[in-house]
UniProtKB/Swiss-Prot annotation:
It comes from Fusarium pseudograminearum (strain CS3096) (Wheat and barley crown-rot fungus). This is Probable glycosyltransferase FCK3. Belongs to the afumC glycosyltransferase family. Transmembrane segments: none annotated. The keyword Glycosyltransferase applies. It holds the Pfam family Caps_synth.
Length: 394
């Protein structure tokens, strides 16, 4: 189906053509193959049992990445399937990964998310590129989100990451040049915290994360997810984010690397509310999962004066014109209200019903190009108090 850009958005969008015109099956088949790393333009993702077993909406996300970014970027969805051409250990040395991950003995909640966390640092450090969660519905070309700036020798930026507030990042999208020392230290700390563990429970009790008791949530008021778990349990879910925070707070990691200074000077901070969670920004956080689910199933030929049509229209065109991507979260067993990813898991094909606003949201990123040259950025926040200890020093 062909969709036109409404007159009111023609100053913000222009028509373009997909850079990969292969069929969905051809794109998936290509991603399944082993491809040696030949550049830093790599998109790294993970699904334990392989790309073919991913939920269909996640496959469509990955196919969208290919249609938007084209052959200049190599997409790899790594896995832990025996004899797989994209097995994690074809790209990462064993000593860079926790034993529980290697032996398959992880027994806590969210093992899939933490498995993706384990491979993120080594891949970015050794090869460079972007680590992206398969729940990311990409809207803007990665070059235009951040990579052109990271590759510019006159730019100070060497890493790009969505930032919520202060030193709190969202780790579902991390872009970095290879051999980056900040990324190396980040993974070193995370690996240290997981040494001897099979689950994340209790990890927030580590003295290395003692700073979390002083975290202020004043600046978190823009983010209103309805968490149903105690704060310590949530913090353990985002343990890798806590490791990033520690690195941002340390003056010197013990070997002369000024990590807090590096954070403030060399990290491009993507405004996550505007660029990543545009749906939540537009509709509000209250019941956002069911609301987005229902709006994206709204038909394009519905009554244009109805509230559902107006809200769906506003949502989709806001995303297409002003977001870099929409992170579709699951937050399984973490919130009172199911998130959009969980609902799409449970309802096959509802993300792209023909003739719906969901289909338009799939079509737009591939066939429309944002005219804006720059994304919304935040300034890297200077820590209120620095940690005067080394990376692993208690």
């Amino acid at each position: 189906m062909h969709f036109a850009i409404p007159l009111e958005y023609q100053s913000e969008l222009e028509a373009t053509e997909p850079v990969d015109v292969g069929t969905d099956e051809e794109i998936i088949s290509s991603i399944e193959q082993y491809r040696p790393v030949t550049s830093e333009k790599n998109i790294w993702a993970f699904w334990d049992s392989g790309i073919l077993s991913m939920p269909s909406w996640c496959k469509r996300n990955v196919i969208g990445w290919a249609r938007i970014c084209g052959a200049d970027w190599t997409i790899r969805v790594l896995d832990m399937k025996p004899n797989s051409p994209n097995h994690v250990l074809k790209f990462i040395d064993r000593d860079m990964l926790p034993e529980a991950f290697l032996s398959g003995t992880m027994d806590g909640h969210h093992t899939g998310q933490h498995s993706a966390d384990f491979i993120r640092g080594p891949l970015l450090h050794h090869y460079g590129g972007v680590s992206m969660d398969v729940g990311c519905l990409l809207i803007r070309h990665i070059d235009r989100i951040c990579w052109d700036l990271l590759a510019d020798p006159d730019s100070p930026y060497e890493i790009a990451v969505p930032v919520l507030y202060d030193q709190t990042i969202a780790n579902h999208f991390i872009a970095a040049r290879k051999n980056n020392i900040f990324i190396e230290k980040w993974h070193q700390l995370f690996l240290h915290l997981w040494n001897g563990r099979t689950h994340q429970q209790g990890i927030s009790d580590s003295p290395l994360l003692g700073f979390i008791k002083d975290i202020r949530y004043d600046d978190a008021t823009d983010f209103h997810w309805d968490w149903s778990v105690p704060v310590p349990q949530f913090l353990e879910y985002i343990a890798q984010v806590l490791c990033w925070q520690r690195l941002c707070l340390i003056r010197d990691t013990g070997d002369g690397f000024k990590s807090s200074e590096y954070w403030q000077r060399n990290v491009l901070c993507i405004d996550s509310l505007n660029e990543v969670w545009g749906g939540e920004k537009t509709l509000g956080f209250d019941g956002i999962g069911p609301r987005m689910y229902n709006l994206l199933t709204t038909r394009l030929d519905a009554d244009p004066d109805s509230t559902a049509y107006k809200d769906a229209y506003k949502l989709v065109w806001r995303l297409l014109t002003r977001s870099s991507f929409q992170k579709v979260t699951r937050a399984k067993n973490l919130t009172y209200t199911p998130h959009l990813g969980t609902l799409w898991d449970q309802n096959e094909g509802k993300d792209c019903i023909p003739g719906s606003f969901g289909e338009l949201l799939r079509y737009g990123p591939v066939h429309f190009r944002q005219k804006r040259e720059n994304i919304e950025q935040l300034e890297a926040s200077e820590p209120r108090t620095l940690i005067e200890k080394g990376l692993l020093e208690v």
